[in-house]
């Protein structure tokens, strides 16, 4: 290992220029969530390991290969959260919120997975999500998808995204499909990867998620879930599709889109893009009516989605995130001016203007820095201005320069 101090592999430093896009995505999501009646929730970045083992499944790649697990000094087995839904579900149970249904939660924050780092994928990544608990109606699925679509429109990437949607049916339909899959894959067991042979015993639907090329060939000819759907499941999905069409959200049905865990049911969906190479999914979600019960709580219907902020920010046009605001530079021409500049800069910030105060250096250099910063105005202070209680205002756009009183400065009409 090099002696040079460096980032841990799979992490990133979010520098100021990147933070502009990142913050824009977060603020846009928060704004849209509030419009849909969601309240913000913050859960710890680590939980008891069992929280994720129960929700993600002992056979999942996340639990087996990707979680950051550790034992604390008290001997407790803890895990850095690999996703946000489990923490929200745990909070719902442990905080006794069952009597307050229906509930809608919005969250954002860092998640952790030991994955192979690549474009758009990090070992510490940032995610935002929405969880709607207490509604059995397919209209809740429609509204959840609508929230996601509105966010993608707000950040300017909806034209590059495709909604892919499918149904998993209810528990009865899934059980029938499971039996059909077991029969199909058992007949081709010798062609399955080792991982999928294990999945065949514990959770055959996970084979459909396999990245192994041999498994993919088998999956192409596997029975389709729609062949196992009962009438109740078909009707539920028809209402979801009708709702999406009523809202004018473009979509395509992807019958290969599944979730391997038993608590998922009915609607599953993803928004995908071709702009990020192999990592095409930017937002994914679905209905999980069995999740709370799996964790030891009461049977509670739920539907939600999550999105990687890193990926959304990579797609967002920079001009959308750049605020059109007046930028003021305060320039002290000499020592007296520099001493007074702190007060003038404070007054401008109180008025709500973005203000940069150059605290040292020659005046010429300060003016160059102000120009490079993109300042629209410079407020120049020298000994004469301090004595006369004035300030010289320079408009970088027009080149106009004039001296005004400090009293006039308090209401001066700065504009772009």
Curated annotation (Swiss-Prot):
Catalytic activity: tRNA(His) + L-histidine + ATP = L-histidyl-tRNA(His) + AMP + diphosphate + H(+)
Alphabetical list of InterPro entries matching this protein: aa-tRNA-synth_II, aa-tRNA-synth_II/BPL/LPL, Anticodon-bd, Anticodon-bd_dom_sf, His-tRNA-ligase, HisRS-like_core, HisRS/HisZ
Principal cellular location given in the protein's record: cytoplasm
EC class (word): ligase
Protein EC: 6.1.1.21
Pfam families, A to Z: HGTP_anticodon (PF03129), tRNA-synt_His (PF13393)
Subcellular location as annotated: Cytoplasm
PROSITE patterns, A to Z: AA_TRNA_LIGASE_II
Keyword annotations: Aminoacyl-tRNA synthetase, ATP-binding, Cytoplasm, Ligase, Nucleotide-binding, Protein biosynthesis
The protein's name in its UniProt record: Histidine--tRNA ligase
UniProt source species: Bdellovibrio bacteriovorus (strain ATCC 15356 / DSM 50701 / NCIMB 9529 / HD100)
């Amino acid at each position: 290992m090099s002696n040079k101090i460096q980032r841990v592999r799979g992490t990133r430093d979010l520098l100021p220029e990147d933070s502009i896009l990142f913050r824009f995505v977060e603020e846009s999501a928060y704004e849209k969530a509030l419009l849909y009646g969601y309240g913000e929730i913050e859960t710890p970045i680590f939980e008891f390991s069992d929280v994720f083992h129960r929700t993600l499944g002992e056979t999942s790649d996340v639990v087996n290969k990707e979680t950051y697990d550790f034992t604390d000094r008290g001997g407790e087995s803890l895990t850095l959260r690999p996703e946000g839904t489990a923490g929200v579900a745990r909070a719902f149970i442990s905080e006794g919120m069952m009597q307050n249904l229906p509930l809608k939660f919005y969250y954002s924050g860092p998640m952790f997975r030991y994955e192979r780092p690549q474009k758009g994928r990090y070992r510490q990544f940032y995610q935002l999500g929405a969880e709607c608990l207490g509604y059995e109606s397919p209209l809740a699925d429609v509204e959840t998808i609508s929230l996601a679509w509105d966010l993608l429109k707000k950040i300017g990437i909806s034209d590059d995204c495709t909604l892919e949607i499918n149904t998993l049916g209810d528990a009865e339909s899934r059980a029938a499909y499971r039996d059909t899959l077991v029969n199909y894959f058992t007949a081709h067991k010798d062609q399955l990867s080792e991982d999928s042979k294990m999945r065949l015993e514990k959770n055959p639907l996970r084979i459909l998620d396999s990245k192994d090329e041999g498994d993919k060939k088998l999956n192409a000819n596997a029975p389709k879930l729609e062949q196992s759907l009962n009438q109740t499941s078909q009707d539920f999905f028809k209402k979801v599709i009708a709702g999406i069409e009523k809202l004018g959200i473009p979509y395509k049905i992807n019958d290969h889109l599944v979730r391997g865990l038993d608590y998922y049911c009915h609607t599953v969906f993803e928004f995908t893009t071709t702009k990020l190479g192999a990592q095409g999914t930017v937002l994914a979600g679905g209905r999980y009516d069995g999740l709370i019960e799996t964790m030891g709580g009461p049977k509670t219907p739920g539907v939600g989605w999550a999105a990687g902020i890193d990926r959304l920010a990579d797609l967002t046009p920079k001009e959308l995130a750049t605020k059109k605001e007046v930028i003021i530079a305060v320039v002290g021409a000499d020592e007296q001016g520099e001493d007074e500049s702190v007060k003038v800069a404070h007054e401008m910030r109180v008025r709500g203007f973005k203000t940069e105060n150059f605290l040292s250096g020659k005046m010429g250099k300060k003016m160059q820095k102000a120009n490079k910063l993109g300042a629209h105005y410079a407020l120049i202070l020298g000994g004469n201005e301090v004595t006369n209680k004035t300030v010289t205002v320079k408009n970088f756009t027009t080149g106009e320069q004039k001296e005004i009183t400090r009293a006039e400065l308090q209401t001066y009409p700065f504009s772009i």
